[in-house]
Amino acid sequence: MQDLVLRPKLTSDRRERWQTADGQTRIAPLPSDVLPGSHFGPDLICFILHQYHHQHVTQPLLLEQLHQWGIAISAGQLSRILTENKEPFHQEKEALLSAGLEVSTYVQVDDTGARHQGQNGYCTPIGNDLFASFESTDSKSRLNFLEILRRPHTDYAINEVALAYWQRQNLATGVQERLSQGPAEFADRSAWEAHLQALGITAERHVRIASEGALLGRLIAHGVRADLVILSDGAAQFEVLVHASCWIHAERPLARMVPSSDAHRTAIEGVRQRIWELYRNLKAYRQNPQASQTPLLEARFDALCAERTALPSVNGVLQEMAAHRADLLRVLERPELPLHNNLSEGHLRDDVKKRKISGSTRSASGRRARDSFASLKQTCRRLGVNFWAYLQDRVRGLGQIPALATLIRQRGEALRVEPAGAAPPVTPAVVR
């Protein structure tokens, strides 16, 4: 018979106090399972963290539950347990993204609204089968996304990568010439913006493109792969490095169409059927890539996108797919890539569920704690680490579970096998 014992446990420690011959005072140490400066034991703290971050229990309900069990705790104490003195967790979370980028050939990304202090904000999850990292920011843009990828660094660099980016973005030649002269490295945003001001570069477009290039240049200099694939739903801010698009998002406009006649329904369903037939063929190619199949699949894609129906809306979807041809067929070059972005959708779903239950964040510490524990929880899930055991290990300071960044690197090295039949790395392309 299995059972669960839930009851409060009150412990009072009496510590011996001695005075030495030279007048110094010696106090007996606390037991190893007592957390310094805390009125609450490690099991209770782990339970609170697990209920709030893993089970999505709100603070009022969690407080009521603890009171019903006889735990003497106030709303303020509960809030402090959830948000304060979490620096070890924050540091471990900050190491996840750099470790993941170090061993990954691709990442999946998405974003969603995440209000903070009554103002609009956004949460961007980045991850793959090895890790997940959530970052909440006040804006969503390509500049913001590059800043997230560059973390924990804060510097900018003008190098060949930056120069190539500016050329692809058609940045004015005069602006490029001014930027290529003088310092090439800048410690932080303040130093970079001061440099732009000194050069007289103040137009919004020029500042934005120049900053994106300098961020991208520093990102590659810090060791991020130039051929790293960013798999997204097609949002423009994610079109950096090598971009791949999600097939489910590409087909979704057709799934949402409401036909006005049987003929329209037949036309829509026919196109959808051919899209999913091609999807299944690409999925089979991914499992067993053969170079001889590549031109055949490309020809089928081109024929599909060249179809025209009596519905302009359907034709528009096909034209949009044709415009994203390289992104949708990226799997032909990189068979390790997923064809959809469901993993990021799942990350967002969990974050949205938490936000709908508990509301938006009100303090900087609360926002940071939500990002950190969401990242740690999802990464534990990816790595097969029991989140309850992880919390126990970290709160008690046992050190039995290695740092998650270490586990990511170990798992990444174990999985690092060149994909069969893969084409040589493609040249990074930030815009179409």
Residue ranges and their predicted role:
Residues 1-18:
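Short, conserved DNA-binding cores of transcription-related domains
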